[in-house]
Structures are given as C-alpha cells and as structure tokens.
C-alpha cells in the first residue's frame, strides 16, 4: 500500500490535501517508508531533480503540493487549529460518525478493520468537502462549480449501499 502511494506520486505528481497531514499522516508515512525501505524520490525532491520542486514540493510547509488545510486555515499557528469534525459540522457537513482518531488503533488491533476503513473514508470526504469550501472562499470555484461539486459528492455517496455512507448521508440530510 505504501509503495503504491509513492508510485502514484512518481507517476502523477498529484496535489495532496490533508487535515493535520503535516502533523500526523505524512510523518507516519515517512517513518514507515524509512523502516520498510520504500523509495520515493519524487516525493522527497526539493528541487535537486526537478527545478519546479524547489519552490513547490511535498516537504516544505508553505508550499502547495501538499496542502495541510488545517495548518493553512489556522494561519500556520498551532494555537488556532480547529478539529475537522467541528469545522465540517459548522460548514453544514456531517463530520465524524462515532469513531475518532483516538479509537483507530484499538479498533484495528481488535480486528475491526472495516470500521477503520469506514472511519478513514468518511474522514477523507469531510476533508474534501471542507477543501471545496476553502476553494470557494479563495475564488478558485465560483458558486455554480462549488454547488456542482457538492451535488456530485452527495449523488455519489447516495448511490452507495455501504452502511457507513447511508449513515453519513442520513447525518448530512439532518443538518
């Protein structure tokens, strides 16, 4: 899985968007790749191989190949960080459904991988929805494009039979 993540970086150079990714998710990937010996030259490039990466790479805090949305919205001030769950709900999105990050290890270690997967998937969607709102705030999306993206997410999730998406959509409809 880790090798696949970095192969995707190598092939497509996608923009990464996270919520506290600089503070948790990416360091976990860094340590795991170090321990397991998983190479990721494009990810670690800071302009040595590709000059475009000198001022926009995945590692530097103020660059945008990796956008830690929590960090940006807090103006890079740790005292101003807000929880994704709270912000998603304040924006009219469902937020987290029962599990939070502090319960992931317990669920995983007791064989409840499906719960962990569902938690991670809903976390990704909450992050995406807040990111879409951020792009609207910045003028990257106009109202029509923003509304279309939110409608696409709603339609896609509504078409799923997975229990966590049914619960998520019920929570969204209740907001």
Question: Where are the regions a protein language model picked out?
Answer:
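C-terminal accessory extensions appended to soluble enzyme cores
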Residues: 145-175
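Metal-dependent phosphoesterase core characteristic of DEDDh/y 3'-5' exonuclease domains
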Residues: 9, 13-118, 122-144, 155-156, ...
């Amino acid at each position: 899985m880790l090798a696949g993540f970095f192969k995707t970086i190598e092939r497509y150079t996608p923009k990464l968007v996270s919520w506290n990714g600089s503070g948790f998710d990416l360091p976990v990937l860094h340590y795991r790749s170090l321990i397991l010996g998983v190479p990721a030259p494009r990810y670690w490039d800071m302009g040595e191989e590709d000059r475009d990466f000198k001022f926009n790479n995945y590692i530097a805090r103020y660059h945008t190949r990796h956008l830690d949305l929590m960090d940006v919205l807090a103006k890079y001030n740790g005292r101003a960080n807000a929880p994704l769950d709270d912000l998603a709900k304040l924006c009219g999105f469902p937020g987290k459904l029962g599990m939070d990050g502090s319960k992931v290890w317990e669920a995983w270690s007791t064989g409840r991988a499906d719960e962990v997967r569902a938690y991670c998937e809903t976390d990704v969607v909450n992050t995406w929805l807040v990111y879409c709102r951020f792009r609207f705030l910045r003028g990257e999306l106009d109202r029509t494009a923003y509304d279309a993206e939110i409608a696409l997410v709603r339609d896609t999730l509504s078409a799923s039979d997975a229990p966590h998406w049914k619960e998520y959509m019920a929570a969204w409809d209740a907001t």
